[in-house]
Design a protein with these regions (language model features):
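Glycine-rich, N-terminal phosphate-binding loop and its surrounding beta-alpha-beta segment
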Residues: 34-63
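Active-site loop segments of alpha/beta catalytic cores
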Residues: 1-31, 48-52, 65-195
Length: 195
């Protein structure tokens, strides 16, 4: 197989019989070793690439609102304007540049990763405003709704530009996932997605 969307650290540990999760948050050498073990697992299972991403929602509410476990942090235009958008690129770099570098140092010749900046625009939007509240925001505060999409899009462009300029060589395919709905229908109007 070419690619798996994600390797769970617990599964990797069972496959290779060595710890991985504890190393991911350790020193740089630990992170490189963790990625080497992920690579070893991928190779052992017959994969040509390994999955690797560091998500945008880690900059918002760490996916808590996306999963329905946290309230909206954007409700008004003042909330959008007060949000520290201009700090998010630096925060992402501080948190994850070392992880991307460890990946590069761990990849054997001929192997690459698939991924990059995790979470798409819609998933990230829902970490600012959970899905149900998002529907109300769209109807009650359409200007806030539109501006929030735009600001998140700008943040995505900044993050992807940084990643591609600094770490693209580690990737065979750069991609993000965005859960937009189901087979039968999207969760929001397709026209909103196209914007």
């Amino acid at each position: 197989p070419l690619y798996e969307h994600g390797f769970d650290a617990g599964v990797i540990e069972k496959v290779i019989g060595e710890p991985v999760a504890a190393l991911m948050g350790g020193s740089y050498a630990d992170k490189v070793e963790a990625q080497r073990r992920v690579v070893r697992c991928g190779l052992q299972l017959g994969y040509d690439c390994i999955p690797f991403e560091r998500g945008m929602v880690s900059l918002v509410q760490n996916g808590q609102a996306l999963m329905g476990h946290a309230p909206a942090i954007i409700k008004t235009m003042a909330d959008v304007e007060a949000y520290p958008w201009d700090t998010k690129l630096d925060e992402y770099i501080r948190r994850f540049d070392e992880d991307f570098s460890a990946l590069r140092d761990a990849l054997p010749e001929g192997m690459k990763a698939v991924g990059g900046i995790g979470n798409g625009l819609f998933e990230t939007l829902q970490d600012f405003v959970p899905f149900q509240e998002l529907a109300f925001l769209q109807m009650d505060e359409p200007e806030v709704y539109e501006l929030l999409w735009s600001r998140i899009g700008d943040m995505m462009v900044a993050l992807w530009t940084w990643m591609l300029e600094n770490h693209a060589d580690s990737f065979a395919v750069c991609r993000f996932g965005d859960d937009l709905g189901f087979r039968s229908s999207t969760l929001i109007n397709p026209a909103d997605i196209r914007k």
